Amino acid sequence: MAKNTTKYVCSNCGAQSPQMIGRCPVCGEWGTYEEEVSTTISTKKGGTSLRRGAQAQRLREVEAQEEMRIDMQSSELNRVLGGGLVPGSLVLLGGEPGIGKSTLALQVLMKMGHRKTLYASGEESAKQLKIRAERLAGDAENLYILAETSLERILDSVTEIQPELVVVDSIQTIGTESIEASIGSLSQVKECAARILQYAKEKNVPFIIVGHINKE
């Protein structure tokens, strides 16, 4: 039995929505959402199959090339990341509160002073971030800071600034308008992480997400 499913897709960045919206929350463009209908067919075993999708390829036919990695200006960081940070990748920097994740993330950006970077914080104000950066005494010439808890506004800033690396600190302190749930809830964290990953892949911008891990 066939079943049609309707969704709306942004023609500019590929973001999806279950309903028609005027402004894309990912790329910020207006009037780019178009209706897309997919047909799902129920199988005899009770499963479903999609008529549209990726096709299987022989491994030897897949074209692959070595990714250009970003030098983190640290031999230890480069080693942990397999030789550097891959553009479009998402890295989770997790740990218990208070162990220095935010300081480490800021140090990473300040080591990359020759590159344009963005530090988006939902925990500290711009003044607090500047004071902490001055204590680290690194190169902040091309470092942008943003005190914001809205995922949409953070991604808008990334689109505007076009940094080569973005830190979001922390994933538990930001929220998206696309779902009705409190900031820090599991549904918000999952949705925000998924949206950031989608944006990173589409725009080829690497992100480092700071995440708190509680004993509970």
What would you call each of these model-derived segments?
Residues T48-D139, L155:
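The Walker A/P-loop phosphate-binding site
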